[in-house]
Amino acid sequence: MRLYVSGPVSGKTHHEAVGYFESAAKLLVSYGYAVSVPTRFVEPTASHATAMRKCIAELLRCDGLAMLPGWRRSAGACLEVAVATACGMDAKAVEAWLERDAS
């Protein structure tokens, strides 16, 4: 199962955002998930619109969405959760994906 990792990026340095997302990605991978992480494919200089187009396209290639803490404070993450939900994908906190019966 491939999970898209969603969370706040704005207000963080690129280095902080990468660390935040990669920590969650490493944990999810250790539980057997494949992951898609926006900081891996969106250039730090991309406009918000360009970033969201790339993120939504990648999200739709995934099977579920793993939400990082603070996602509700991010307009982009809220949009990603709405798209995932509208498309019938499970959207849960990262920790919820780690429970035995999560997948």
Show which residues each predicted segment covers.
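Conserved catalytic or regulatory cores that recognize and/or transform ribose-phosphate-containing ligands
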Residues: M1-S103
